[in-house]
């Protein structure tokens, strides 16, 4: 591994059809500019999901920078990626809080899941990806991703939406229109733009229509309140550290978030393959390292109260649009994120996002997460005419979405995402073992890549990053192999 990035040509924007490789860079001013684009790309989801999970958004942004640097070091600067907040844990976190857990319980459970993810990465590194494909075929992976997303429907419907239904409706509508009407990079940040729109709309309504009467999150009775209050912003310091939270550990709560590991493995593998396709480099030897690095990043972030991390499709999209794959730009983005995390006033501004705005955003995001499970099925040609796929996965999905509970004792039970995921995995393998030979043979015609195209919970409205050219038009994949341009050494 080296930090001595080679200067690409004269350090200016690469010509049409050429690209800047991971071990190259443009001039430092241009590299800083590319890094700024990566900050904007990751920003929306990186602070929206901590807010939804009840964690400190400022700390999440800061630790995303730390996790990104750790990731780049572990993969030896060969896999350019940014680690932002993962959406895969939102359902498990909601279940923890519904069962009386607090933020310490949440980050403790996430830390355990991070350890499991890191161990899976080690297993992939030494045993190969084939073992994971056997345990978690696309049919099962898609089912787990789907139940994670759709299990969250009551959170959006009962917690956020009722706080301000009209702002929620307006925000949701804006996100839908923006994702369709805008093009290129702006379409990829439709969620962030929707949040800004809802934020400003709430300020305008407070000024013109006055306070609103509704039930705030966690309350049982309706009260009159402003949609947004800037008191905490005025009281916050300009420079300081975020609020840290020490983790506490519980087997019950850990089991609620461990199913997210399945989604993260699929997501990481899919993203590494997308980067490999764009850079025209063989990154299969880095697959295990990338998964392990994501796990390590999650462990370190959650150890101080931060959010879980994952590689971001939005940032892969920025690389596809600019054809600048330099890891130097990611170090710049990570440093900027760390500095933003050290500004409490910035964090206070984030933490006062109105509940109605989150209501409009979450109905879109949670639905997108669930439908990405169907995307995995489609891209891997999963055959639901085959009872091996249809029957066990149907049971697992309904158990997960319906929040069915299996009680073992007064102190221990499984429900929702955890129980649904276990049923989906175990019942599928049991059905496969008991099925006649012709049903087993039909499975061989399905795809074998559990992560094909999956981008869990963010960036899914963007085109496939591996088929976007330098100006963001989908479907153009030609161009020279990165690293073939002239260098100044």
Residue ranges and their predicted role:
Residues 100-208, 334-442:
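Membrane-embedded alpha-helical modules
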Residues 55-61, 77-90, 132-141, 187-193, ...:
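Short, non-helical or kinked segments that cap or interrupt transmembrane helices
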Residues 418-489:
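Terminal cytosolic tails of multi-pass membrane transporters
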Residues 9-10, 15, 43-46, 174-178, ...:
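Juxtamembrane interface elements at the cytosolic ends of transmembrane helices
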Residues 42, 198-207, 216-302, 306:
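Membrane-embedded hairpin module used as a gating/binding unit in multi-pass transport
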Residues 1-80, 88-100:
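N-terminal signal-anchor module of multipass membrane proteins
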Residues 93-99, 179, 315-330, 336-341:
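Interfacial segments of multi-pass membrane proteins
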Residues 18-32, 49-72, 256-327:
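Membrane-embedded helical hairpins/re-entrant loop segments and their flanking transmembrane helices
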């Amino acid at each position: 591994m080296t930090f001595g990035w080679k200067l690409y040509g004269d350090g200016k924007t690469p010509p049409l059809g050429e690209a800047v490789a991971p071990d190259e860079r443009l001039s430092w001013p241009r590299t800083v500019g590319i890094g700024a684009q990566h900050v904007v790309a990751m920003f929306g989801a990186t602070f929206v999901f901590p807010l939804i999970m009840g964690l400190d958004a400022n700390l999440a942004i800061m630790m995303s920078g730390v996790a990104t640097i750790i990731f780049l070091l572990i993969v030896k600067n060969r896999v350019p990626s940014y680690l932002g907040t993962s959406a895969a844990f939102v359902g498990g976190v909601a279940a923890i809080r519904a069962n009386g857990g607090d933020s310490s319980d949440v980050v403790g459970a996430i830390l355990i899941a991070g350890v499991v993810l890191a161990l899976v990465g080690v297993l992939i590194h030494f045993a190969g990806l084939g073992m994971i494909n056997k345990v978690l075929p696309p049919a099962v992976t898609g089912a787990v991703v789907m139940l994670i997303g759709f299990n969250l429907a009551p959170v959006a419907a009962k917690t956020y939406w009722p706080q301000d239904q009209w702002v929620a409706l307006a925000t949701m509508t804006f996100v839908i229109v923006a994702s369709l009407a805008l093009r290129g990079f702006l379409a990829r940040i439709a969620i962030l733009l929707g949040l800004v729109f809802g934020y400003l709309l709430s300020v305008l309504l407070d000024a013109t229509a006055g306070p609103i009467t509704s039930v705030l999150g966690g309350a049982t009775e309706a009260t009159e309140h402003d949609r947004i209050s800037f008191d905490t912003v005025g009281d916050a310091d300009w420079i300081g550290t975020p609020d840290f939270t020490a983790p506490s550990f519980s087997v019950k709560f850990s089991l609620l978030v461990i199913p997210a590991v399945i989604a993260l493995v699929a997501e990481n593998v899919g993203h590494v393959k997308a980067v490999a396709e764009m850079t025209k480099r063989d990154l299969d030897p880095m697959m295990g390292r990338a998964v392990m690095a994501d796990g390590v990043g999650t462990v370190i972030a959650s150890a101080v109260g931060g959010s879980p991390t994952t590689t971001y499709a939005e940032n892969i999209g920025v690389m596809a649009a600019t054809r600048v794959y330099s890891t130097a730009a990611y170090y710049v983005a990570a440093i900027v994120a760390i500095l933003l995390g050290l500004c409490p006033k910035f964090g206070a501004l984030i933490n006062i996002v109105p509940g109605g705005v989150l209501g409009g955003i979450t109905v879109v995001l949670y639905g997108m997460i669930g439908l990405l499970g169907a995307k995995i099925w489609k891209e891997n040609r999963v055959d639901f005419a085959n009872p091996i796929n249809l029957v066990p996965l149907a049971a697992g999905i309904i158990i997960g979405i319906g929040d069915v509970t299996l009680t073992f004792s007064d102190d221990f039970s499984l429900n929702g995402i955890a129980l649904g995921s276990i049923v989906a995995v175990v019942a599928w393998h049991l059905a496969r073992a008991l099925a006649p030979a012709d049903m087993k043979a039909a499975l061989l015609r399905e795809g074998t890549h559990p992560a094909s195209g999956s981008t869990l919970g963010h960036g899914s409205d963007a085109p496939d990053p591996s088929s976007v050219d330098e100006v963001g038009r989908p479907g153009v994949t030609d161009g020279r192999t990165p690293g073939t341009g002239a260098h100044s050494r």
